[in-house]
Amino acid sequence: MDILQFPINMLNYFYEISGVEVGQHFYWQIGGFQVHAQVLITSWIVIAVLLGSATLAVRDPQIIPNGAQNFLEYVLEFVRDLARTQIGEEEYGPWVPFIGTMFLFIFVSNWAGALFPWGIIKLPHGELAAPTNDINTTVALALLTSVAYFYAGFTKRGLGYFGKYIQPTPILLPINILEDFTKPLSLSFRLFGNILADELVVAVLVSLVPIVVPIPVMFLGLFTSGIQALIFATLAAAYIGESMEGHH
């Protein structure tokens, strides 16, 4: 009974985490729900940038790629190699779109927060920021990753997937269950904490010292933002590969 209660308590904990707020926020009231408008607006902008860039890059495909098409193919090869390394040569193919979507959305979101002056867009309450600056976004991305590796393991190994929870001994059942629920927790907090801290440091420096001084910190933030996107995508692919590795 306690073992069954633990996942329920963890889900309740994630629900409480999703209500964490830093600063003021702008909400839309849709029916009986409050929707976090800041996250939706900036997420839609990031999605539009990604879709627009991809459309422009492939609107006139060439046999010998150049310009935007060449860059897009380089990104695709990078994501494909990442998925192949973490998931395995035989199984990585179907997961390239998922890993690529995660990587590109997080990467562009992080850089949007570091490069775009969101403060010039005025809202009734609060201000716009990178989507990954909000824990609701990072928790959602982490939960999607959890669903993905549960799905990968179950479809590959069937009911035998759940046998991993009692290996190497049934005594470790609670710990193995805890491990699966802490994976999305660590993913979400790592991404949220790094992006929020970077934006706060830059904001404080800009308010205290001339604009030239924070520039090195801003460049460091760009580097950190890219690394965080890579870490998230790498861990997501590694979790998916791990969930399927007991098949052979």
From Swiss-Prot:
The gene is atpI. It is a multi-pass membrane protein. It comes from Cryptomeria japonica (Japanese cedar). InterPro entries: ATP_syn_F0_a_bact/chloroplast (IPR045082), ATP_synth_F0_asu (IPR000568), ATP_synth_F0_asu_AS (IPR023011), F0_ATP_A_sf (IPR035908). This is ATP synthase subunit a, chloroplastic. Keywords: ATP synthesis, CF(0), Chloroplast, Hydrogen ion transport, Ion transport, Membrane, Plastid, Thylakoid, Transmembrane, Transmembrane helix, Transport. The lineage of its organism: Eukaryota, Viridiplantae, Streptophyta, Embryophyta, Tracheophyta. The chain crosses the membrane at residues 38-58, 96-116, 135-155, 200-220, 221-241. GO terms for cellular component: chloroplast thylakoid membrane; plasma membrane; proton-transporting ATP synthase complex. Key component of the proton channel; it plays a direct role in the translocation of protons across the membrane. F-type ATPases have 2 components, CF(1) - the catalytic core - and CF(0) - the membrane proton channel. CF(1) has five subunits: alpha(3), beta(3), gamma(1), delta(1), epsilon(1). CF(0) has four main subunits: a, b, b' and c. Disulfide bonds: none annotated. Pfam families: ATP-synt_A. SUPFAM superfamilies: F1F0 ATP synthase subunit A (SSF81336). The keyword Transmembrane helix applies. It is found in: Plastid, Chloroplast thylakoid membrane. One of its GO terms (molecular function) is proton-transporting ATP synthase activity, rotational mechanism. Belongs to the ATPase A chain family.
